[in-house]
A protein has these predicted regions:
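Positively charged n-region of N-terminal signal peptides that target proteins for export
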Residues: 1-4
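A compositional/structural signature for long, glycine/proline-rich flexible linkers
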Residues: 23-178
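Bacterial N-terminal signal peptides
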Residues: 7-17
């Protein structure tokens, strides 16, 4: 038993020396490490910002604060945003909104749009990088009633009849309907 412990300790010491030597050969220059840090910041910043926005917008009962409500529920705002509204950078002050955050952690979500009888509407869907990946509405899909299945990454289930599939790049999606 004692010889096995000694052999194990010697083996770890030798392996540690080998690993330490390998790490020393691959160390980064300060400029390269800084560049990697900047790239990581730029890549993850939108994800963090959108997640903070999501948590602030959905951790409340509907109707308590302008445009905010629980996950997986549209909150329709029946009045124009006030000039003091600062939840997003620049909302339109002459537009009525219906806003939803959807969580597809466990399953896809169905989003239904009514027949608007030729009236303009738009349902831009933003991923967690804040990129619009789909925008059902007057210009892209017409104004007749439609059902959309928003599928999370990797979802392979079957599509119900008459439902249009939209693949989301992230499991959380922000819909800013107008």
């Amino acid at each position: 038993m004692k010889s096995q412990v000694i052999a194990a300790l010697v083996g770890m010491a030798v392996a540690g020396g080998v690993c330490g030597h390998a790490l020393a050969e691959t160390s980064l220059a300060e400029e390269e490490a800084h560049a990697i840090g900047v790239d990581a910041y730029l890549y993850f910043y939108p994800l963090v910002t959108m997640d903070v926005t999501r948590k602030q917008a959905t951790n409340i009962e509907p109707g308590k604060v302008f445009g905010r409500g629980p996950m997986n529920m549209f909150v329709s705002v029946p009045e124009y945003p006030p000039a003091s509204f600062r939840d997003v950078v620049r909302p339109n002050y002459d537009t009525l909104y219906s806003i939803a955050w959807i969580d597809m952690t466990n399953e896809p979500m169905i989003v239904s749009a009514p027949d608007t009888h030729g009236r303009y509407y738009l349902l831009p869907m933003l991923d967690m990088w804040s990129d619009v990946f789909a925008s059902p509405g007057w210009r892209t899909t017409g104004t007749e009633a439609a059902n959309y299945l928003v599928a999370p990454p990797g979802w392979t289930g079957s599509l119900p009849n008459g439902v249009i599939r939209i693949d989301a790049p992230t499991r959380f999606v922000w819909i800013i309907g107008r």
